Amino acid sequence: MSNLVDFQIRALCRESGLVEPFLPEMINPASIDVTLGNKILSEGLICGPEALRTRWVEHDLADDEEYILTPGAFILAHTNEYVRVPVNLEANFQLKSSRGREGLDHLLAGYIDPGFHGQITLELTNVNQRHNLTLKPGMRIGQLRFGRLKEVPTRSYAKTGRYMNDKGAIPSKG
């Protein structure tokens, strides 16, 4: 597998909608920056027989609205960008180093299969012990790296994936 570089990512964004909306200034030497979307799912109170239905509380943020992530809190968020990974590529999401230095952590589900289309759900937590983090729709949250596969898989996520075409922050489907 070989990683794509700036001009290859730019060409795929323009020709096949690899990442939309596409802004050329988001291109890095071997990745493209993505921004935080406007839907956040936070943990609700879990007690009683309705616990499974009330686990998540949805927050639909306006573009200028902030979400305060308290120390130790866990949320599901999503990228503003819609990603279309061709079947001959794979992708990985990584948090921007600036976000990590602030105490934000993205948990381990950063792999994006060949053939996936949709917004990327992000599993975020504040690892600070004392300080809140402010999240805002549109802020640069991470970057996507793309790798070219040596062969095209016999199965595509487009046919087998349970999170295909998702939009917004999506909890586990099992």
Question: PLM ranges: what are they?
Answer:
Residues M1-G174:
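DUTPase catalytic domain/fold
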